[in-house]
Amino acid sequence: MSFATADLCDAHEDQLALGTLRVLEPVFHLFSRAGCFSGEAVTLKVFEDNALVRATLEEKGAGRVLVVDGGGSQRCALVGGNLAQIAQQNGWAGIVLNGCVRDTLELNEVNVGIAALATCPRRGQKLGTGERGVAVQLPGALVRPGEWIYADSDGVLVASAALK
């Protein structure tokens, strides 16, 4: 599906006013060759630990978007080239990460959309801590499981339901 978040905002101003369509703060950068991505949100809340991220991406994605609240930490990466490959193999549409990525040259080779705050070469821990299926607070909006994510180079949108 090809779209522009700017056009979606223009077409759904009523939902913006109601709060059923929200815009994340402009702190996310795209780190893959996918120009835009969208899908139903699967949420995780972790901190400097990517074991739950890996476990989730190893499941069938079915065109969904993994939304990870990494607490905004920029001390380590939660997603890198290996996890991006796993996400692509399992049919995930994208990843929105309130945290860092690494292996950016490898990320540029995958067709999974990846939006994150920044890069960091250090890997995250693998302790298995965190929560799945909870509402997560990202910069600018709360994201609930089952809501819809739309992302491109202009920004990231969160919609209560799929946009037509």
From Swiss-Prot:
<comment type="function">
    <text>Catalyzes the aldol cleavage of 4-hydroxy-4-methyl-2-oxoglutarate (HMG) into 2 molecules of pyruvate. Also contains a secondary oxaloacetate (OAA) decarboxylase activity due to the common pyruvate enolate transition state formed following C-C bond cleavage in the retro-aldol and decarboxylation reactions.</text>
</comment>
<keyword id="KW-0456">Lyase</keyword>
<dbReference type="InterPro" id="IPR010203">
    <property type="entry name" value="RraA"/>
</dbReference>
<dbReference type="GO" id="GO:0008428">
    <property type="term" value="F:ribonuclease inhibitor activity"/>
</dbReference>
<dbReference type="GO" id="GO:0046872">
    <property type="term" value="F:metal ion binding"/>
</dbReference>
<dbReference type="GO" id="GO:0047443">
    <property type="term" value="F:4-hydroxy-4-methyl-2-oxoglutarate aldolase activity"/>
</dbReference>
<feature type="binding site">
    <location>
        <begin position="80"/>
        <end position="83"/>
    </location>
    <ligand>
        <name>substrate</name>
    </ligand>
</feature>
<protein>
    <recommendedName>
        <fullName>Putative 4-hydroxy-4-methyl-2-oxoglutarate aldolase</fullName>
        <ecNumber>4.1.3.17</ecNumber>
        <ecNumber>4.1.1.112</ecNumber>
    </recommendedName>
</protein>
<feature type="binding site">
    <location>
        <position position="103"/>
    </location>
    <ligand>
        <name>a divalent metal cation</name>
    </ligand>
</feature>
<keyword id="KW-0479">Metal-binding</keyword>
<feature type="binding site">
    <location>
        <position position="102"/>
    </location>
    <ligand>
        <name>substrate</name>
    </ligand>
</feature>
<dbReference type="InterPro" id="IPR005493">
    <property type="entry name" value="RraA/RraA-like"/>
</dbReference>
<dbReference type="InterPro" id="IPR036704">
    <property type="entry name" value="RraA/RraA-like_sf"/>
</dbReference>
<dbReference type="Pfam" id="PF03737">
    <property type="entry name" value="RraA-like"/>
</dbReference>
<dbReference type="GO" id="GO:0051252">
    <property type="term" value="P:regulation of RNA metabolic process"/>
</dbReference>
<comment type="similarity">
    <text>Belongs to the class II aldolase/RraA-like family.</text>
</comment>
<dbReference type="GO" id="GO:0008948">
    <property type="term" value="F:oxaloacetate decarboxylase activity"/>
</dbReference>
<comment type="subunit">
    <text>Homotrimer.</text>
</comment>
